[in-house]
Amino acid sequence: MKKALVIRFLAGIYYIQDLDNQTILKAQKKGVLKKSNFIQDNQLKNNRDKMSIKVGDIVLYGMCYDKYLIYAILPRKNELKRPNIANIDQVLLVFSLVKPHFQTLLLDKFLLILQQHKLDVILVFSKIDLIEKEELEEIQQNMNYYFPFYTCYYVDSKQQIGIGVLKNIFEQKITVLAGQTGVGKSTLLKALIPDANLKTQEISESLGRGKHTTKNAQLYLFNNGFIADTPGFSKLDLGGFSYQNLKNFYPDFLKYVDNCYFGTNCLHLQETQCGVKEALTQGKIIPSRYSNYCYFMEEIKKEKKIYVKN
């Protein structure tokens, strides 16, 4: 059997790219697949865990009569459910500065979820041509706060502004384009790969959100790597976080924990001696970052019906 990368799934057909000769083939799944591992003698060993194929999977395939069949999925280094994709190297998180307007609340929620999956994140802000210069400079100044942890790019995909500097980050990686519907992911992909078969989304004036054109994740070969276009996000769930552990996903908070009376047990909310709140008052933490944290803590408390003594 040979190895291939799953680059697309459509109507029961998997489009796979052979890892040796780069040929793109159409294949079908052979019965119920099981998670596979290679052992020392290079023989295939199956366990009982049933698996569904995701875009980004490395699979074993072979010819059966007149068609190609996928027999097994090799171990994944990571995976997401929304979007449904595996073996991600980095996430290009795209935000629109207008239509829909940029919100730090949405940014921080995305960052939490992606950090929970231990994924490297690069921030891209689109539609810079539709915003006033002064407003753009203000946003850039606020985003400098995130710069020690995340690289930021500002682009106008239609005019190719800022696109050139992006091209080198894709080499030898599977990069996922992620973001809210209508932020310009498909337009950005079109700017990077002009022959990508995409339709630019129209923005619904009545709802202020984009209409779906990307139905399923798909990998596009680019600069010796792959870019994954994914469906837009309409809902982000914090169900994987707890009231106690959310703070651990704020790298900018961690350096102030030593100044908290309760140390790593401090929730940075109502405690009287809190290094994070002290850093906030000193301007070392931007107000939106902390207020979003409090909002998420309240969201988790309501969702999990946690009762906190005042």
From Swiss-Prot:
State a single Gene Ontology molecular function. Answer: metal ion binding
Residue span, CP-type G domain: 77-236
Superkingdom of the source? Answer: Bacteria
Cofactor(s) recorded for this entry are: Zn(2+)
Q: Does the keyword Cell membrane apply?
A: no
- Output the GO biological process annotations, alphabetical, semicolon-separated: ribosomal small subunit biogenesis
Q: May I have one GO cellular component term?
A: cytoplasm
Q: Which residues bind Zn(2+)?
A: 260, 266, 268, 274
What name has this protein been given in UniProt? Small ribosomal subunit biogenesis GTPase RsgA
